[in-house]
Curated annotation (Swiss-Prot):
Keywords (A to Z) from UniProt: Acetylation, Activator, Biological rhythms, Nucleus, Phosphoprotein, RNA-binding, Transcription, Transcription regulation, Ubl conjugation
Positions of modified residues (Phosphothreonine): T176
Residue span, RRM domain: 675-751
Organism, as annotated: Rattus norvegicus (Rat)
Gene: Ppargc1a
One Pfam family cited in the UniProt record for this chain: RRM_1
Induction profile: Up-regulated in brown adipose tissue of diabetic fatty (fa/fa) rats. Exposure of fa/fa rats to cold resulted in a much smaller increase as compared to lean rats in which a 2.6 fold increase was seen. Leptin is required for normal basal and cold-stimulated expression in brown adipose tissue and hyperleptinemia rapidly up-regulates its expression. It is induced not only by cold exposure but also by prolonged low-intensity physical exercise in epitrochlearis muscle.
Post-translation changes: Phosphorylation by AMPK in skeletal muscle increases activation of its own promoter. Phosphorylated by CLK2. Heavily acetylated by KAT2A/GCN5 under conditions of high nutrients, leading to inactivation of PPARGC1A. Deacetylated by SIRT1 in low nutrients/high NAD conditions, leading to its activation.
UniProt keyword Signal present: no
Phylogenetic placement of the source organism: Eukaryota, Metazoa, Chordata, Craniata, Vertebrata
Protein name per Swiss-Prot or TrEMBL: Peroxisome proliferator-activated receptor gamma coactivator 1-alpha
Length: 796
């Protein structure tokens, strides 16, 4: 081999040829030794150093192809030009040596970087016959420093089994080798021996490398062992981290271009720094995989029992109310960790169970309402509920303020109608029991799948807003309290227990309509009853109570689309949901007043909470269809009246224009009939009545007008009924002049009377005028003649 021949020469030739050409390429022994002791390492530039090695990469391939099969004539076929170029490269690269923190040339840094570089550019055929992996991108200098092993040695003499073909594939990645050898030669000029070069260099960042490269699993384990071990481990991070290392360790046994043989103590076999995959794995390990772990609890558990099933043992009583879960437990269930979701919750621990229990129990004991009300409920205990956790603290604070403010609000409201509900008759008790049993039977069974379905919850949030936003505004409550103060509590006592008690409305989202519970509207042409009038029988709930009220169950199912379209937005300032009773356009057969009724959609149940003691008749900020109907009707009436006025004005203007045109025609006719006399040079103080009286002696006058000129002279027009009278006035009108007046100017009315005296009438000479004399030659031509004339002019 060429390497064995060169090993007998000087140390400089040995190192230089090994770096530039390779361990199995012909070497050049004629290069003179250079004294590099006076070089200043501070002037070295890494970029120019790496750029200057382009010749080495190209020439090494040329030399490999040219002298591959002739090792005996190696030194005879290297010409002087290659020697000169080699010297030029050496001289240029001496100025680009990097410097470490101690002021010495960073030889081992580049050497370690070369180990990684040559390792990435693996040869096409390995000594053990395994196929090489794909060539990875050349890492940066920082990656070379961090990813190189700590005790890399340059044992060039140990690499003696590589073939020429293996090295030929490395010629394009061998650029940094000359810098390694020359750097060693430049700063270790005192001892030029290969033993110095083979001395292990301790890396400054070895401690960092030990910390970064620490791994629980050995890097040289087989893929089957890794799969078995990772199956036993719970962390998915180790499984994703060790398998790429083991796969690359199996597919890529180590054969480096540098003489790090598998027999050397620095065997990089199974090293975690063989390729880019290990770098990516290391970056994942450093950054952490907390956000990559999948949720441990699926959104839907079909194999478990329904945790939201209400207890059937609860019985309604006037003074017993099931205590709702506390706020701490309610919010901890929604924002708990994922590990807690893996354990199955009991029915009493789920928040939706508390929702159903609360909604299915009749709240007769209104002294319990004086205590703090439960805060808002969040829907699920799954991973998709975590989106509302960011607002949990704000909602808790708002809910606490709400409950504190609600303590005093319900004292006045509950004291008046508390006894009315609690002291109801036996028939009313039967009615309440039937209602409660119906809600218990329908709610857990028919809505079981709906409560567990994420789409139904999302649909509820879409139409009615999220319950986290359904919070009362204290200012709004105070304002409405002043408005509601003047209303009697007697009408509120007649409100149905269905609304006051917060029972579940089973037919809320059912579109079915029964004849018994169908709501009749007066505009539909059917018989209508007031919603809160006392009905003789509660037909919708089959209750014999005469004093109870029967709000039809289809009130909220008759027109669900309109209700949902009007109740999409919850706001913190106006937290009342737009319901058929309030702020919506749904036609509720109530009075013209509106309500501040608030609807909380919790656990797919529609809970109606009336605002303090204000029934649906009380005037409030919400607008009902009846309150807006008069304004709407008046607007239509005003619009109709305005249209009528516009039409009348147009007709009047049309009539006036017709009258004016008629008067103008009559005037022209009178002028043509010579019935209009022009009277000029009258006194400026002459009135129309005076002028009319003076000229009426000649006949009946139809119209008389007086006009003033700018120069102070006045004139008038007198229209007689008959032409003969006009002629008489024209002939004898001068006799009416007084002694202090000038003579009148009397003419038949025409255009001449309004022009200057020097006006010349040119119409008398109209017979002498020949209009044909002014025509050009083109006027006498027809269209065809004109077209031909134009074409001839274009040809010219």
């Amino acid at each position: 081999m060429a390497w064995d021949m060169c090993s007998q020469d000087s140390v400089w030739s040995d190192i230089e040829c090994a770096a530039l050409v390779g361990e199995d390429q012909p070497l050049c022994p004629d290069l003179p030794e250079l004294d590099l002791s006076e070089l200043d390492v501070n002037d070295l530039d890494t970029d120019s150093f790496l750029g200057g090695l382009k010749w080495c990469s190209d020439q090494s391939e040329i030399i490999s192809n040219q002298y591959n099969n002739e090792p005996a004539n190696i030194f005879e076929k290297i010409d002087e030009e290659n020697e000169a170029n080699l010297l030029a490269v050496l001289t240029e690269t001496l100025d680009s040596l990097p410097v470490d923190e101690d002021g010495l040339p960073s030889f081992d840094a580049l050497t370690d970087g070369d180990v990684t570089t040559d390792n990435e550019a693996s040869p096409s055929s390995m000594p053990d016959g395994t196929p090489p992996p794909q060539e990875a991108e050349e890492p940066s200098l920082l990656k070379k420093l961090l990813l190189a092993p700590a005790n890399t040695q340059l044992s060039y003499n140990e690499c003696s089994g590589l073939s020429t073909q293996n090295h030929a594939n490395h010629t394009h990645r061998i650029r940094t080798n000359p810098a390694i050898v020359k750097t060693e030669n430049s700063w270790s000029n005192k001892a030029k021996s290969i033993c110095q070069q083979q001395k292990p260099q301790r890396r400054p960042c070895s401690e960092l490398l030990k910390y970064l490269t620490t791994n629980d699993d050995p890097p040289h384990t087989k893929p089957t062992e890794n799969r078995n071990s990772s199956r036993d481990k719970c962390a998915s991070k180790k499984k994703s981290h060790t398998q790429p290392q083991s796969q690359h360790a199996q597919a890529k046994p180590t054969t480096l271009s540098l003489p790090l043989t598998p027999e050397s103590p620095n065997d990089p076999k199974g090293s975690p720094f063989e390729n880019k995959t290990i770098e990516r794995t290391l970056s994942v390990e450093l950054s952490g995989t907390a956000g990559l772990t999948p949720p441990t609890t699926p959104p839907h558990k079909a194999n478990q029992d329904n945790p939201f099933k209400a207890s059937p043992k609860l019985k309604p009583s006037c003074k017993t109310v099931v205590p709702p879960p506390t706020k701490r437990a309610r919010y901890s269930e929604c924002s708990g960790t994922q590990g807690s979701h893996s354990t199955k919750k009991g029915p009493e621990q789920s928040e939706l169970y508390a929702q159903l229990s609360k909604s299915s129990v009749l709240s007769r004991g209104h002294e319990e309402r004086k205590t703090k009300r439960p805060s808002l409920r969040l829907f699920g205990d799954h991973d998709y509920c975590q989106s509302v956790n960011s607002k949990t603290d704000i909602l808790i604070n708002i809910s606490q303020e709400l409950q504190d403010s609600r303590q005093l609000d319900f004292k006045d409201a509950s004291c008046d109608w508390q006894g009315h509900i609690c002291s109801s008759t036996d028939s009313s008790q039967c009615y309440l029991r039937e209602t409660l049993e119906a809600s218990k039977q329908v709610s857990p069974c028919s809505t079981r799948k709906q409560l567990q379905d994420q789409e139904i919850r999302a649909e509820l949030n879409k139409h009615f807003g999220h319950p986290s936003q359904a919070v009362f505004d204290d200012k709004v409550d105070k304002t409405s309290e002043l408005r509601d103060g003047n209303f009697s509590n007697e009408q509120f006592s007649k409100l149905p227990v269905f609304i006051n008690s917060g029972l579940a409305m089973d037919g809320l989202f059912d579109d079915s309509e029964d004849e018994n519970d169908k709501l009749s509207y007066p505009w539909d042409g059917t018989q209508s009853y007031s919603l809160f009038d006392v009905s003789p029988s509660c037909s919708s709930f089959n209750s014999p109570c005469r004093d109870s009220v029967s709000p039809p169950k289809s009130l909220f199912s008759q027109r669900p689309q309109r209700m949902r379209s009007r109740s999409r937005s919850f706001s913190r300032h106006r937290s009342c949901s737009r319901s058929p009773y309030s702020r919506s356009r749904s036609r509720s057969p109530g009075s013209r007043s509106s309500s501040r009724s608030c609807y909380y959609y919790e656990s797919s149940h529609y809970r109606h909470r009336t605002h303090r003691n204000s029934p649906l008749y009380v005037r409030s900020r919400s607008r009902s269809p009846y309150s807006r109907r008069p304004r709407y009707d008046s607007y239509e009436a005003n619009e109709h009246e305005r249209l009528k006025r516009d039409e009348y004005r147009r007709e009047y203007e049309k009539r006036e224009s017709e009258r004016a045109k008629q008067r103008e025609r009559q005037k022209q006719k009178a002028i043509e009939e010579r019935r209009v006399i022009y009277v000029g040079k009258i006194r400026p103080d002459t009135t129309r009545t005076e002028l009319r009286d003076r000229f009426e002696v000649f006949g009946e006058i139809e119209e008389c007008t007086v006009n003033l000129r700018d120069d102070g002279d006045s004139y008038g027009f007198i229209t007689y009924r008959y032409t003969c009278d006009a002629f008489a006035a024209l002939e004898n009108g001068y006799t009416l002049r007084r002694s202090n007046e000038t003579d009148f100017e009397l003419y038949f009315c025409g255009r001449k009377q309004f022009f200057k005296s020097n006006y010349a009438d040119l119409d008398s000479n109209s017979d002498d005028f020949d209009p044909a004399s002014t025509k050009s030659k083109y006027d006498s031509l027809d269209f065809d003649s004109l077209l031909k004339e134009a074409q001839r002019s274009l040809r010219r």
